Every structure is written in C-alpha cells, then in structure tokens.
Amino acid sequence: MFLEDASDALYPMRTYIESSMTEEGNSVANMMCLMTTRIEAIAKGIDKEQIASFVHAVLSANRIYVMGAGRSGLVAKSFAMRLMHTGFISYVVGETITPAIAEGDLIVAFSGSGNTKTIGDIAETAKGIGAKVALISSNPDSRIGRIADYIIKIETQRDPVTCDAHEYEIRQMLGEHRSFAPLGTIFETSSLIFSDAVISTIMTMRQIEE
C-alpha cells in the first residue's frame, strides 16, 4: 500500500518531467530550424564572384595557411584539416610545425569583426612578404578587410564589437566578449558550412571521392 501511495504521489512529478522534456525537445528542434533558415539566407547573400575568386585562390596557392581566434580558430583548424585531406598543403598559424609563409602562399583569416589584433598583425606581415590574404568575416570594412585580396562576407547582422584594441582572450577574460543571443555562434556556424561547401566544390571539380 505504501509503495502504491508513493507511486501515486510521484505520478504528477513524472508527468511534469516528461512534459518538460517534450517542450525542451521541441525548443531545440525549433532552434535548429531557425538557425537553418538563417544560414540559408546568409548563403544566398554571399557574393558569387567573391566565392569564385576565393576558390580559385585556394586552387592556385602554393600552400594555404589558416588562422582565427576563439571559436573562429576552431573553424580555421577544421578547414585546414579538410584541405589536407583533399591533397592541399595546409597549415594552422601558431602551431609548432608551421613553417614560414612565403610569396605564392595564401593565408585565410576567419574573423567576425575583421579587427582581431593578433590576426590583423599576422595578416599584415604575410601581405608584406608577398602572400595573398583572404578574409572570411561579417565586417569587410575592417583592418584585415582593407588589406585582403579576397573577402567572403558572412552577413550575420550581429552587434559590432567595440573593443577591438584588445586581444580576443583578454576581452573574454574581462567579460567584454559578449554572446549575441539567440544566435551567438551564427558567424562561426556559417563559416564552417561555407568552408565545408568550398571543400565539397573542389572535390567535385577534381573528381575526388571520400
């Protein structure tokens, strides 16, 4: 009898938990649909001539260097790995095995603001050496954008970062690197999908199978 009473007492709680889990599941699915719709709009808005120029730059480069800070850095590393798997010579800037850049190489910067200090410093150095600079950013009118040979604009409509004089890590520690709710990672997600699409296009052009 006691067990039956306890079970009856717990029934409303179980019902509430199950209902909450269903609502959370629906919320996640709805958010995925929202992000998919937003990324589709972003993809359609990217200049097709810019894409073609970028793909040509990748195909014609002697070596490809990639870089980014924070989440953008993770996207850059993913792109470098996929390039390597496709037969390109690719490096991540800052790794211990990365050789010096030279004329004829391409450096690809992933930066939402286009103003991250370390990324800008490296881009300017590479440009001075004679390498080509490509920028994946939501802000082409930026420090890196002004020296870039190729620009892919990822239009995210995110609020501007107002403290570009600080390093990404310093802004993060100070709490000045804000999350842009509800789609705070939309630039990185769109950049990742864009870079994967570039790889897929090159694989098709070169008739490479997975």
Where are these regions (language model features)?
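An accessory alpha-helical subdomain
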Residues: 183-197, 201-208
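A short, well-structured juxtamembrane/interface segment
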Residues: 43-60
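Alpha-helical scaffold segments in soluble metabolic enzymes
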Residues: 34, 41, 53, 193, ...
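Generic N-terminal amphipathic, Lys/Arg-enriched alpha-helix
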Residues: 2-44
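Active-site phosphate/pyrophosphate-binding segments
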Residues: 48-49, 53, 204-210
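Glycine-rich phosphate-binding loops that contact phosphosugars or nucleotide phosphates
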Residues: 65-69, 75-189
